[in-house]
Amino acid sequence: DINASMDKYLTEGVFQVLPESLVYIERQQSDGRIRHGLIGMVDLDAYDFTPGSGALIRATEGTVLDRIPPRARVRRNAPIELPHVMLLIDDPDKTVIEPLTAASGEMETLYDFDLMQNGGHIRGYKLTDRQVDAVADALEGLTSDEAMQKKYGVSGVAPLLFAVGDGNHSLATA
């Protein structure tokens, strides 16, 4: 039973709570290419899947409302919730992720292991408080009127910070 497995993981201390943290990820694919990203949390009130929404976090595909109740039922009695949601940013000046790549040596390594089935290798690093603040500032900069004008040639419109690239229904269920 999946809930029993979750309880077991919680009891055994498999998971570590990292309040107010961000985790920088480097995933080396089996072909040698490295993908970079961040793991964190978002304000669910900043998300809206309604077409034409002006929310900071928006869906990139239609949300099928019938898919939400089954997902909610599965999660109802779950002791933990760990859905994957991939959020995309439009950061042409490389202000968010790239500074972290150069500074990963300053971060605490949380994990570093090979993935199964030739999936490559993954490393996760906990950002310092200073780096978390820098990421927050960089993300805020992406929503400025100046940034919207530079990227899209528009101003005075509701900025888009994150586009949901995968996991839209999981985010809608949350």
Predicted segment positions?
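N-terminal extension/subdomain marker
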Residues: 1-118, 126, 149-152
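Short, contiguous, pocket-lining structural segments
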Residues: 79, 127, 131, 162-169
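Glycine-rich phosphate-binding "P-loop"
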Residues: 116-137
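Active-site beta-strand/loop microenvironment that shapes enzyme catalytic pockets
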Residues: 141-174
